[in-house]
């Protein structure tokens, strides 16, 4: 147990700093865990699978007895064990990706716990010496020369084939894509075209090149819209000092309607006929409210606007 306590104490000093527990507190915690049967062997302390049961048991004991000494010590030890394990896994993964060996991901054992600075320097020196001794024979080895062999007979030296220096046959395409190898030959049959000269363009009356897409005739579209669309009519507007005011399109009709409303009221047959004639024209709601302002008085117009809205 002394060796385990020493390793755990060293790890706590490395990762916990000034808050690391003493060896006496660590020993008391380990004895309590063995007494309660949470640790069959001290090596089980390094297994992550036993951390949760230990935490649960110590938490329950602290709640029942009201003593949290072992729980506090276990919290510091657990933090040190997790930090050491993460550092070991990260180091092994880095070695694996860099091709330096390692790459295992497993629960850390006693050898995975952080060692003191002196031991780390000694181990680092031994590893460097071993790596240098392993790489030395490979560096001093003479490089092998690879001889070139004949393409037909396979003889490296003394080939008498007439086609020994002939290049391999050209690559034949699969036929999925068109080849441009014969385009230059077809152009060269009619004469060499100097570099930078403009290629002759196909005339409109000649065949040989597919015509391009037809352009949109916007002028024709505008004429068709102007002939088939609704007529565009602008309402006359008079600009006054207080702002724009509506001008009736039919002054005589508006004047007659105003006179009929003034003489017989809104319910008179003449007024109703005049209103129907006025409403038969394509007027917008804003255009309807303007003649009512002219025909009606201030009070009837206010009542009519409330009913209209």
UniProtKB/Swiss-Prot annotation:
**Chain intervals with Basic and acidic residues compositional bias:** 127-137
Q: Site annotation (Cleavage): which residues? A: 151-152, 162-163, 173-174, 235-236
Annotated region described as Disordered, given as residue ranges: 127-146, 177-213
Its keywords, alphabetically, are:
Capsid protein, Host-virus interaction, Viral budding, Viral budding via the host ESCRT complexes, Viral matrix protein, Viral release from host cell, Virion
Pfam families xrefs: Gag_p24 (PF00607), Retro_M (PF02813)
What biological processes does GO assign it?
Answer: viral budding via host ESCRT complex
Tell me the InterPro entries matching this sequence: Gag_M, Matrix_HIV/RSV_N, Primate_lentivir_Gag_pol-like, Retrov_capsid_N, Retrovr_matrix
GO (cellular component) term, any one: viral capsid
Q: Which domain of life is it from?
A: Viruses
Q: Name one GO molecular function term.
A: structural constituent of virion
The name under which this protein is listed is: Gag polyprotein
Q: What organism, scientifically named, is this protein from? A: Fujinami sarcoma virus
């Amino acid at each position: 147990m002394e060796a385990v306590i020493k390793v755990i104490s060293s790890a706590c000093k490395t990762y916990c700093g000034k808050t690391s527990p003493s060896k006496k507190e660590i020993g008391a915690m380990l004895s309590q865990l063995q007494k309660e049967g949470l640790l069959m062997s001290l090596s089980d302390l390094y297994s992550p699978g036993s951390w949760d049961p230990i935490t649960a048991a110590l938490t329950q004991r602290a709640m029942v007895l009201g003593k949290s000494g072992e729980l506090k010590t276990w919290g510091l030890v657990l933090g040190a064990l997790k930090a050491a394990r993460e550092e070991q896994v990260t180091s092994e993964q880095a070695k694996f990706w860099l091709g330096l060996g390692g790459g295992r991901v497993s629960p850390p054992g006693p050898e995975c716990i952080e060692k003191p600075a002196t031991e780390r320097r000694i181990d680092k020196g031994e590893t460097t010496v071993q790596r240098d001794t392993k790489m030395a024979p490979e560096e001093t080895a003479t490089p092998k020369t690879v001889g070139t062999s004949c393409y037909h007979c396979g003889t490296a030296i003394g080939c008498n084939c007439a086609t020994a220096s002939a290049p391999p046959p050209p690559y034949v395409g699969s036929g999925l894509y068109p080849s441009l190898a014969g385009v230059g030959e077809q152009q060269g049959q009619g004469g060499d075209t100097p570099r930078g000269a403009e290629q002759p363009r196909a005339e409109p009356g000649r065949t040989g090149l597919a015509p391009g897409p037809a352009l949109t005739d916007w002028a024709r579209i505008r004429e068709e819209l102007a002939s088939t669309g609704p007529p565009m009519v602008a309402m006359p507007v008079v600009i006054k000092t207080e702002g724009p005011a509506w001008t009736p399109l039919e002054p005589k009709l508006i004047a007659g309607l105003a006179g009929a409303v003034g003489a017989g009221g809104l319910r008179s047959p003449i007024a109703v006929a005049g209103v129907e004639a006025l409403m038969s024209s394509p007027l917008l709601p804003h255009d309807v409210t303007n003649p009512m302002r002219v025909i009606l008085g201030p009070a009837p117009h206010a009542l009519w606007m409330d009913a209209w809205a």
